[in-house]
Swiss-Prot record:
Lineage: Bacteria, Pseudomonadati, Pseudomonadota, Gammaproteobacteria, Legionellales
EC number assigned by the record: 2.8.1.13
Alphabetized GO MF terms: ATP binding; tRNA binding; tRNA-uridine 2-sulfurtransferase activity
Reaction catalysis annotation: S-sulfanyl-L-cysteinyl-[protein] + uridine(34) in tRNA + AH2 + ATP = 2-thiouridine(34) in tRNA + L-cysteinyl-[protein] + A + AMP + diphosphate + H(+)
Sequence similarity: Belongs to the MnmA/TRMU family.
Function statement: Catalyzes the 2-thiolation of uridine at the wobble position (U34) of tRNA, leading to the formation of s(2)U34.
Pfam family, one: tRNA_Me_trans_M
Residues the record marks as site: Interaction with tRNA: H124, Q340
Organism of origin: Legionella pneumophila (strain Lens)
UniProt region (Interaction with target base in tRNA), positions on chain: 94-96
Name under which the protein is recorded: tRNA-specific 2-thiouridylase MnmA
Positions of region (Interaction with tRNA): 145-147, 307-308
């Protein structure tokens, strides 16, 4: 009998089709719906309840059982606490990376193993190869949807227990499969917003957990131009929501966030989308989480992304210095953001990644 695979069912189209593909391939397939956020229960509209209903409907259509599990405590302790602490430092974190590492490919994997699973599967756009107890990560066929950026922190051992059924298909193909099968999720729009929390108004949401400290908005020359609502609400390269248009003695060019000074609680801005302060020659990152055996081959010339869907950028990684690496780019990079992740690639293979600590102008 073929292996038992438990699919993480999110209530979306990708995981729905992933489950169907595995069933078609002869696996013993079961679904599992993870609830990772409790706060919605007190609102009039609860997206988690709708997602669970959709996941259940799909599993009924595919005639597979659906398990449910609540990982809210794990999510709060391992993902959300970090998310808040980073924002309190004035940085811009990416909770989806930690959510994959700690919840989907750790808590979920371990729970699935207790249910007798040989593998887990998800609806991520990615590919992997398995050699013994180690998994290697590769880009999906659909480069527009490729999610390896968000998966770079998953442990290689977890990747060896994972199947990515939709990695060889494009999003339009996945939607077409779902439509032909009559799955209730075939036209459901893609989820956006914070991992598992959904499309909340970000400012309002963050204000529930962190006390905002308003402060000065200054030009790079030190002139006070206005007031910000709290450094946590702004990210490098941001243009919207600054409220400083139409200043006397300034050009019509828009203003952009170019720096944050946490000590003085000051937001620095500059005019023009090509302002030199928006660009960096390189960055300093923390320890690299390697998914391939390259750590003994530094310095290394490869490619990298500093944000999702960015085109791969040529770079060189230095050997570690006090647990940090210098990464220098062949071309200046716009709006690199501390707290986000740099993810490294060699052709289609994801080599790993690290947290961006500082920019090098």
């Amino acid at each position: 009998m073929k292996a038992k695979v438990i699919v993480g069912m999110s209530g979306g189209v990708d995981s729905s089709v992933a489950a169907w593909l595995l069933k078609e391939q002869g696996y013993q397939v079961e679904g599992l719906f993870m609830k990772n956020w409790e706060q919605d229960d007190h609102n009039d509209y609860c997206p988690a309840a709708k997602d669970l209903a959709d996941a259940q409907a799909v599993c009924n259509q595919l005639r597979i059982p659906l398990h449910t599990v609540n990982f809210s405590k794990e999510y709060w302790d391992r993902v959300f606490a970090y998310f808040l602490s980073e924002y309190e430092k004035g940085r811009t974190p990416n909770p989806d990376v930690l959510c994959n590492k700690e919840i989907k490919f750790n808590a979920f994997l371990n729970y699935a193993l207790t249910l007798g699973a040989d593998y887990i599967a998800t609806g991520h756009y990615a590919k992997n190869t398995i050699e013994g107890s180690i998994g290697y990560l590769f880009k999906a066929k659909d480069r527009e949807k490729d999610q390896t950026y968000f998966l770079h922190a998953v442990e290689p051992e977890a990747l060896s227990k994972t199947i990515f059924p939709i990695g060889d298909f494009t999003k339009p193909q996945i939607r077409e499969f779902a439509k032909q099968l009559g799955l209730v999720t075939h036209a459901k729009k893609d989820s956006t917003g914070i991992c598992f929390i959904g499309e909340k108004r970000f400012k309002t949401f963050l204000n529930e957990f962190i006390l905002a400290k308003p402060g000065d908005i200054k030009s790079t020359g030190g002139k006070t131009l206005g007031q910000h609502d709290g450094l946590m609400f702004y990210t490098l390269g941001q243009r919207q929501g600054l409220g400083i248009g139409g200043l006397q003695n300034s050009t019509d060019e828009p203003w952009y966030v170019v720096d944050k000074d946490i000590a003085s609680n000051t937001l620095y801005v500059a005019q023009g989308s090509q302002h030199p302060m928006l660009y960096s020659q390189g960055l300093i990152c923390g320890p690299i989480h390697w998914l391939a055996d390259y750590e003994n081959h530094l310095p290394l010339t490869c490619f990298a992304k500093t944000r999702y869907r960015q085109t791969d950028q040529a770079c060189m990684i230095s050997p570690p210095d006090n647990n940090q690496h210098y990464v220098m780019f062949s071309n200046p990079q716009r709006a690199i953001t501390p707290g986000q992740f740099i993810v490294f690639y060699e052709k289609n293979q994801c080599l790993g990644g690290a947290t961006i600590e500082q920019i090098i102008r």
